[in-house]
Amino acid sequence: MSQIKLIVGLANPGAKYEETRHNAGEWLVNELARVFNVTLKEEAKYFGKVAKINTPQGEVRLLVPTTFMNLSGKAVGSLANFYRIKPEEILVAHDELDLLPGVAKIKQGGGHGGHNGLKDIIAALGNSNNFYRVRIGIGHPGHKDLVASYVLGKPSPSDQPLINVAVDEASRCVELLFKEGIVKATNRLNGFKA
């Protein structure tokens, strides 16, 4: 079982997007930064905001790419190459249309499900999809033609608190992962519903 050395929160950059559903991955990394009392700082060579946290498993880097979503692989690839971090040592937090608000799940591998951030990361890691994901449920608008505007919109007043609770629980499960490993963290988070 490899340990996690890099946690990535997928997002689009800028104030215009920070409260949109597509930025749910960033919300998780921001929460981890708050819990570990670190500040994410822009680092141009990694095309993102970066912080280092010390965990029971050793040093872990937090990353929020400052590229647009469809270029997320540039940031992940740069940092992973520099620190020689393998795909299976990476945890990517992202918004998930196929899960309801209030639900978040950890999984390893799989396709990108049309998520442009995941698609670019898979390409940047030499077509490896073997990294872990924290899938943060945002719900589905009901039709594929509505997806683009849906993910770039803000959650409804009823969905936002549910997503927040799921992000908080996901953060606690990442802390559990550092202490007791990915299996325990996965079992706890995958059984959770707000």
From Swiss-Prot:
Residues at which tRNA binds: Y17, F68, N70, N116
Enzyme kind, highest EC tier: hydrolase
Recorded catalytic activity of this chain's protein: an N-acyl-L-alpha-aminoacyl-tRNA + H2O = an N-acyl-L-amino acid + a tRNA + H(+)
Domain of life: Bacteria
Sequence intervals crossing the membrane: none
GO cellular component, one term: cytoplasm
Record carries keyword Transmembrane: no
Cell location: Cytoplasm
Site residues by UniProt (Stabilizes the basic form of H active site to accept a proton): D95
SUPFAM superfamilies in alphabetical order: Peptidyl-tRNA hydrolase-like (SSF53178)
Residues at the active site: H22 (proton acceptor)
Entry GO MF terms: peptidyl-tRNA hydrolase activity; tRNA binding
EC number: 3.1.1.29
Marked site positions, Discriminates between blocked and unblocked aminoacyl-tRNA: N12
Gene Ontology BP term (one): protein quality control for misfolded or incompletely synthesized proteins
Assigned keywords, A-Z: Cytoplasm, Hydrolase, RNA-binding, tRNA-binding
Similarity annotation: Belongs to the PTH family.
Biological role: Hydrolyzes ribosome-free peptidyl-tRNAs (with 1 or more amino acids incorporated), which drop off the ribosome during protein synthesis, or as a result of ribosome stalling. Catalyzes the release of premature peptidyl moieties from peptidyl-tRNA molecules trapped in stalled 50S ribosomal subunits, and thus maintains levels of free tRNAs and 50S ribosomes.
Known partners and oligomeric status: Monomer.
Protein name: Peptidyl-tRNA hydrolase
